[in-house]
């Protein structure tokens, strides 16, 4: 798997030179802190029960700029038991507590608004984790449903008699869909692949004179490696590559520095010519992350950047994180 991770980093130059178009799914800068929103296989992957709240304001100060709010939860169904150490036929053997569990569950609620169009949805996830010595291979499947809404009263129509804009106008539509993901992790590195909008459903919204709005499959590749630099410091380069079936790629290259797993900071470069600053702090089981995106284009003159806040609460002691790996 380390060879696959190296190959993943070799894809970066090619991905960086490809074109970029608008995508239908929201953008996240704190994707490492809440990877479950990107890959359903990460539901319960670390053994914690996690609750996350994320708020993102794109292009602050720009009228009708995109806004995203989400609340998510995922957990591992753990089974506590005991294992025998020594000869089970003798009386001097020992019973040592052990923790097992292969099933992860998760759910989220999201509201994503962009100008006069809003999307609100729910998702439910089932994940299955397979132990491979001190590594783990995970699969996840999500079923989701969304409501799309157009705020017609805020639209500006061109001509009063335009049949496209002033005919039968569906302001609300509903769409079911599904996501699938694979995730592999070790103590010091991780890599994942996921597909969103598997069903590519059509959304009957807007004027009947226009073709149906179709959701496109989105493909995500996530990877990272943690380098230990002494007792307290850690360095983690990471990448997030995403595209649609029409080949509209976008990539994030991130470098984060950790101090004793209590503080972290880093920088990301996104292929839409954005620089992202990330900072975070952990207080016991509470994780707080903030990111600031600054465009390197003319767009920067018309807004005050993009801001994202992520708050995560993880239940369970620190040792629980890898206790399920040593299952024998």
Task: Map each language-model feature to its residues.
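Sec/Tat signal peptide C-region and signal peptidase I cleavage site
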Residues: 18-22
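Bacterial N-terminal signal peptides
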Residues: 7-17
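Positively charged n-region of N-terminal signal peptides that target proteins for export
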Residues: 1-7
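Subset of outer-membrane beta-barrel
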Residues: 23-328
